[in-house]
Amino acid sequence: MEPRVVKPPGQDLVVERLKSRYGLGGSCPDEYDFSNFDQSKCKRRTLTSPGDLDIYSGDKVGSSLKYSDESKHCRTPLCSLFKRVNVNCLDDELDSFHDLKKRETEEELIENDYRVSTSKITKQSFKDIEKVALPTNTTSSRPRTECCSDAGDSPLKLVSYPKSRASDKRSLLPRQISQIYDELFQIHLKLQCETAAQQKFAEELQKRERFLLEREQLLFRHEDALSKIKGVEEEVLTRFQIMKEQHDAEVEHLTEVLKEKNKETKRLRSSFDALKELNDTLKKQLNEASEENRKMDIQAKRVQARLDNLQRKYEFMTIQRLKGSSHAVHEMKSLKQEKAPVSKTYKVPLNGQVYELLTVFMDWISDHHLSKVKHEESGMDGKKPQLKFASQRNDIQEKCVKLLPLMTEQLQWMPFVNTKLHEPFVKFIYWSLRQLDAGAQHSTMTSTLRRLGEDIFKGVVTKGIQDSSPQHSVENKPKTAAFFKSSNLPLRFLSTLIVLKTVTQADYLAQAFNSLCLDLKTEEGKTLFLEYQAVPVILSHLRISSKGLLSNVIDSLLQMTVESKSLQPFLEACSNSSFFRTCSVLLRAPKLDLQILEKLSTILQKLSKIKSNKKLFELFTIHLMLQEIQRTTNPEHAFLCINLNSTLFNLGLTKCNSLVSSASH
C-alpha cells in the first residue's frame, strides 16, 4: 500500500509569500506589477539536478511559518534591493517559483515529528541570511547581474544581463548570492538527509504494514480455525454428554450388581458360618464318640478277660465234679475223641485236576438243574406245578440230602485247593439248600446245616502235614479258607446267603445282613441278588418274631428299590403271593415300629405301580390295611402319609379313601 499524499496547508500561497518577502507584492505596487505577467515572454528553465526538488520539498510548512514571522523586518531592504534588478531576472525567478509550485504540489507530506525538527533548522538558516542581507542592501544600490550559475543546485537560476551593466554589478552581487547559495546548499544537504530518513521510515512503515497484513491473514486463519474448533467443541461436548450418560448408566448397573454380589456374599458367609458351627459341633460329637468308644473298648477288653477267666473256672469246676462221678473217665475219652478229628492232619491228593473237573460238573449242575427252583416258585401264585416237575423235584431233593453232609466234610479240604475253585463249590451248596426249601424239612439235616453255616461264616483253618518223628516235629504254617469274609464279592455274597439259610444265632445273622446291605449298594451286588434269587431267603426272616433283625431285613430290601437298572427285575421278583402274604402278616402285627412301617410303605408304593399287582393287594387285603393306617396315622408323619396316599392312588382307591374318611366323620 502506497502512503497517502496530502497537500500541506497554504501551499498555494507560497509564491505570494515569496513575493511579499522580496518586495514584489503589495509593498511595491507602483514599481512592479506581476499579477498580469505574461509567462510566454520568458523562457522557463528547468532544474538540472534532481536534488533541487528535494530542497524545496523538504520543509514547506516550516518555511512558510518562518517567512510569515520575519517578513515584517526584511521587506523594505529587499524591495530596495530588487528595484535594481532587471525585470528579466525577476521574470525568470517568477517562472522558477511557478515551477516550484507545480513540483511542490506533487510532493508527499512527511511525518509531523520530522517537520518540526526541519522547521527549526530552516528558521535558523534564514535568520543568518537576513543578517547578511541587511547591511548589503543598505550599502549597495547596483543591480545584480546574475542570480545563480547554470551549474548550481539553487532553486533560482539567474540570467546574465547586458555586458555593459554586468561589469558594474559583479563586485557586489556574487558574494551575497554565494552566501545565500551556501546556506541553501546546507539546507539542501540537511533536507536530503531528512528525505533519506523519511524514505527509510517509509520503508519501515511498509514493512510494518506488510507485517500487519500477515498478522491480519494469520488472524483470519486463526478465526477460521477457531470457528472449526467451536464446531468440533460442540460435537465433542455432545459426545462427551452421551458418554457421561452411558458412564452413569453403567456405574448404576455395576452398583446394582455389586449390591447383589454383596448380598450373595453375605448369604454365603452366613451359610459358611452355620456350616462351620455345625462342623465344630460334629467335631465335638466325634471327639466325644471317640472317647466313649475308647472307654467301651477298654471295658470290652475287661469283660472279655473276665469271660475267659469264668470259662477257665467253669472248666476247672466241671473237671472237679467229673472226678467224683463213676463215669468221669468215659466222658474224658469222649471229649478226646471229639477233639481228635480237628487235630488230624490231611494230605492233599496228588492229582489236583480232579477238583477242577468236579467244579466244572458242579457249575453245570447248579446252572442247569438246581437253579430251576425259580420256575417252581413262580408257580406258587395260585397255579399248581405239573406232576412231572413234582416227581423230578422229589428226586433232586433226595440227592441233595445225601450230598450236603459229604460236601460239608469236604469244606475241610478247601484250604488246600485253589481259591478259584471255592466259588463253584459254594454255589453248588447254595442251590442244594434252595432245593430243600420246596420239600419237607428233614430233622436229620439240622446238625449238618448248623455245622455248614458255622464253617462258612468262620472259615476253615487247617494245619499242614505233620510227621510223628521227633526230627520233624516242627509244624507247617496253618492254611485258611475264607468264605463269608472273603474279598471276592460273588463268593462272599453266596456265603452270606448260605449263612442266612443255615444259621440261627442272632449275632451271626446280624453280621450277615450288615454285609448284605453293604454289597447291595453296588450294581454288581444287585445283579448277584437277582441272579441267585435271594428274595425268598430274605422273606424267611421278614417276620415279627425276630424284632432285632427286622430293621436289617427291611434295609436289605430297601437297597434294591433304589433307582437303577435292577429295580424293575426286583419288583417283578417280589410280585408273588409269598411276598404279599409275608407283608400282610407283618402289617397285621400290633404296634409296628414307625420306621419299619415307613420303609415297608416305600416298597409297597413301588409295587403298586405294576397294574398286575392290584389283584395281590386285594387278595391279601393289604389295601384295606393301608387305608386304616392312613386314617389313624398322625399327619405329622409326612413321609408315611405321602407313601400311603401314593400307593392308594396307584391302586385307584383315593376316592374310596375320601368316602371312608367322610363316613367316619
From Swiss-Prot:
Modified positions (Phosphoserine) are: 49, 469
Q: Which UniProt keywords apply?
A: Coiled coil, Phosphoprotein
Does the keyword section mention Coiled coil?
yes
Top-level taxon: Eukaryota
Record-linked InterPro entries = CCDC138, CCDC138_C, CCDC138_cc
Asked whether the keyword Phosphoprotein is assigned, the reply is yes
For the modification Phosphothreonine, which residues carry it? 48
Coiled-coil residues are 198-323
**Can you name this protein?**
Coiled-coil domain-containing protein 138
Tell me the classification of the organism that encodes this protein: Eukaryota, Metazoa, Chordata, Craniata, Vertebrata
